[in-house]
Amino acid sequence: MAIAISFDRREATSRFVALTRSRHARIADDMAMLRTAAALTRDLNSPRPEVYWVDLVTSCLVGYTALALAMSLASPVLAVIAGAVAILALYRAGSFIHELTHIKHSAVAGFRLGWNLLIGIPMMVPSFMYEGVHNLHHARTRYGTPDDPEYLPLALMKPWSLPLFIGASLLAPIALLIRFAVLSPLAALFPSVQTVVVARYSALSINHAFSRRAPEGALWTQWQLSSAVTSIWAIALLAMVATGVVPLRAFLIFLAVGSGVAVINQVRTLVAHLWENDGEVMTVTAQYLDSVNVPPPALLPVLWAPVGLRYHALHHLLPGLPYHALPEAHRRLSRALGAGSLYQRANYRGLFGLVDRIIRSTMLR
């Protein structure tokens, strides 16, 4: 999940592009690793509904309680602490949007509806903004290409691109308010506006060139219903602020918490991949090596890469595994393939080393 932002792929043009392109093009699939990964994890593919529901509901309870405290506490210090807790808990709850794109909805009955009611609509990120988008990122011949809505060659871009990439996420709550309080009503009235809104403003993506197609049939009905309910909430929220029902301070804290969630997610996105591919079609193994695991003993990924996102490379290897199965899958593969295996090459120690790596890469442009 990432906030939409525009960059020009031509910024990546340099002698390093050719080197990276040829390096990725040379990576063949490690069939032994792929077969081992599939064989060792066949019994881990079933999602456990009780884990999903308890995790989501607990995260929401903690997040909204902390948000209410941040809005009501008189002490600035305590309010900031409560706000930080709200950011982390609501970020965890929001991260389940990623699981929604992968699990069979019948396997965790009602979870999509529950997630939208608990977090998607209140935070103005209904699941249709990601469903139908993220699966394209996993398509075998799309990953890392201009057709991938969730990929940019960030490691090959100019140094200024990284602070812009992170900084833009600060405005996410404002952008979402405009999307649902302004653009959604206009789209309902004017078909030409709807065409633009669907294509350009209905996806959580980072590739500015991505243009979304409207779904059909029942999915389109579901999309319109979710959009309408979110729009009503966004308009009602602004109306309550304008009339004093919701204090301005509380509204600003809500926006600040939303910005905090978006920034953490954008930082997590920045280190989810190495971003070293400049448009070439990649093998599954190459995609795995362009992705990142941050396994134990690192502790902080529990906060900044929750709901299985710390095993992002493994997720690209086995996208069907539910998030709660990824730690066990990682342990099995690590034991079976050994310390010197290609599998271990996607494992990294922590956030700061990964950020330093991509910053150094952009400094070479």
Feature locations, PLM:
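Non-catalytic, topology-defining segments of multipass membrane proteins
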Residues: 1-86, 121-251, 323-365
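Residue-level signature of the transmembrane alpha-helical core
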Residues: 56, 60, 83-84, 88, ...
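Transmembrane alpha-helical segments that form the membrane-embedded catalytic/substrate-channel core
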Residues: 87-97, 126-130, 253-282
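Histidine-centered catalytic micro-motifs
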Residues: 94-103, 130-142, 269-277, 306-321
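Aspartate-rich (DDxxD/NDxxD/DxxxD) Mg2+/diphosphate-binding motifs
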Residues: 95-114, 142-154
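Membrane-cytosol interface motif
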Residues: 113-119, 279-293
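Cytosolic juxtamembrane regulatory segments of multi-pass membrane proteins
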Residues: 205-214, 287-303
